[in-house]
Regions:
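Bacterial N-terminal signal peptides
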Residues: 1-5
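Gly/Pro-rich cap/lid or specificity-loop segments adjacent to the active site
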Residues: 10-199
Length: 199
């Protein structure tokens, strides 16, 4: 298995900076990496974030050069956390194409946006779903998130997230890619196609 992982790593440019990793529910080894991105593309020397991704290498010897990129749902789901179920669902593609899972900015390991909120599951349902209570929680959450080093929430958008995905594509040296999305991920995939029709 180690030899297989090393051989798979050599199929990608050294600039991709991939290393062997384990993902829950994935039988074969995976390769993980990250690309450094400006939080605000208009300020390339400003705050930087790392966009993390995983590659599940194709198992066939004669693989196709165009990987499959999976866009998770939500928005807010970690694509890497879904590696096990997604690799099973996309096994037909994964036999001959690498499968790439990108934790988009704000999700998973890529500048995550998580609020530590009180556990309200013990409250009566009417109180849990009270509109005013929810609005207050959202306002509190926004304040918490804005204090993060990467807390400019205006920079966590679908158009910027797909630009990050294209940076992953470039790091992997893929000239053409295939897109698969689930739920919100279909919208992100369409935005990618709109911005980068050449790939």
């Amino acid at each position: 298995l180690l030899g297989w992982q090393c051989a798979a790593a050599h199929a990608f440019p050294a600039a991709a900076g991939l290393s062997a990793c384990r993902l829950k529910g994935v039988e074969h080894g995976a390769l993980c990496g990250s690309v450094r991105r400006a939080l605000d593309p208009a300020q390339p020397s400003g705050t930087q974030i790392d966009v993390h991704y995983a590659v599940l290498p194709a198992v066939a010897r004669n693989k196709h050069p165009d990987p499959v990129f999976f866009f998770a749902g939500g928005p807010g789901q970690s694509a890497m956390a879904l590696a096990g179920p997604i690799s099973g669902l996309l096994a037909r593609f994964g036999n001959r194409r690498d499968l790439v899972l990108v934790d988009q900015r704000g999700t998973g390991r890529s500048a995550p946006l998580h609020c530590a909120v009180d556990d309200e599951t013990r409250l009566p349902l009417a109180e849990q779903f009270d509109a005013q209570r929810q609005l207050a929680r959202l306002a509190d959450c926004r304040i918490v998130l804005q204090k993060l080093p990467y807390g400019d929430l205006r920079r966590f958008t679908t158009p910027l997230a797909v630009q990050d995905v294209d940076a992953v594509r470039a790091a992997l040296g893929a000239s053409r890619i295939n897109l698969v999305g689930a739920s919100y991920g279909t919208r992100a995939a369409l935005e990618y196609q709109r911005q980068f029709p050449q790939h």
